[in-house]
Amino acid sequence: MRLNTLSPAEGAKHSAKRLGRGIGSGLGKTGGRGHKGQKSRTGSGVRRGFEGGQMPLYRRLPKFGFTSMKSAVTAEVRLNELTKVEGNVVTLETLKAANILTKDIQFAKVILAGEVKSAVTVRGLRVTKGAKAAIEAAGGSIEE
């Protein structure tokens, strides 16, 4: 077997539709576009959500909500990521230094995911109840 002798399995590839190549092809004349109308013309069609001039659904419904900018600068930190920090004190700065958080993150919360094996001191970060219990069970502490 050589690369130049490889070919797809029989029936695996379908031949392309050749539009406008005579009546016998089944796709001659109108080429599968039907007769007349906006969608039969070349370079034409309607945009997404267009309903023929009727007020479209996305404009009939009221606006709602917004995206909080605080969510863009907030991150979650798993328990097993705390072990990647050098030393046993975990702060926002040490997490950034260990490449766990990006430099634009301003707030972080330690969540109960993974395991913490060594005693660590978490300083200045928010911590969930479960994560707090796990850190204290491993001999660590949480400082505000």
From Swiss-Prot:
<dbReference type="InterPro" id="IPR021131">
    <property type="entry name" value="Ribosomal_uL15/eL18"/>
</dbReference>
<dbReference type="GO" id="GO:0019843">
    <property type="term" value="F:rRNA binding"/>
</dbReference>
<dbReference type="GO" id="GO:0022625">
    <property type="term" value="C:cytosolic large ribosomal subunit"/>
</dbReference>
<dbReference type="Pfam" id="PF00828">
    <property type="entry name" value="Ribosomal_L27A"/>
</dbReference>
<feature type="compositionally biased region" description="Gly residues">
    <location>
        <begin position="21"/>
        <end position="31"/>
    </location>
</feature>
<dbReference type="InterPro" id="IPR001196">
    <property type="entry name" value="Ribosomal_uL15_CS"/>
</dbReference>
<dbReference type="GO" id="GO:0003735">
    <property type="term" value="F:structural constituent of ribosome"/>
</dbReference>
<keyword id="KW-0689">Ribosomal protein</keyword>
<comment type="similarity">
    <text>Belongs to the universal ribosomal protein uL15 family.</text>
</comment>
<protein>
    <recommendedName>
        <fullName>Large ribosomal subunit protein uL15</fullName>
    </recommendedName>
</protein>
<dbReference type="InterPro" id="IPR005749">
    <property type="entry name" value="Ribosomal_uL15_bac-type"/>
</dbReference>
<dbReference type="GO" id="GO:0006412">
    <property type="term" value="P:translation"/>
</dbReference>
<keyword id="KW-0694">RNA-binding</keyword>
<comment type="function">
    <text>Binds to the 23S rRNA.</text>
</comment>
<keyword id="KW-0687">Ribonucleoprotein</keyword>
<comment type="subunit">
    <text>Part of the 50S ribosomal subunit.</text>
</comment>
<dbReference type="InterPro" id="IPR036227">
    <property type="entry name" value="Ribosomal_uL15/eL18_sf"/>
</dbReference>
<keyword id="KW-0699">rRNA-binding</keyword>
<feature type="region of interest" description="Disordered">
    <location>
        <begin position="1"/>
        <end position="52"/>
    </location>
</feature>
<dbReference type="InterPro" id="IPR030878">
    <property type="entry name" value="Ribosomal_uL15"/>
</dbReference>
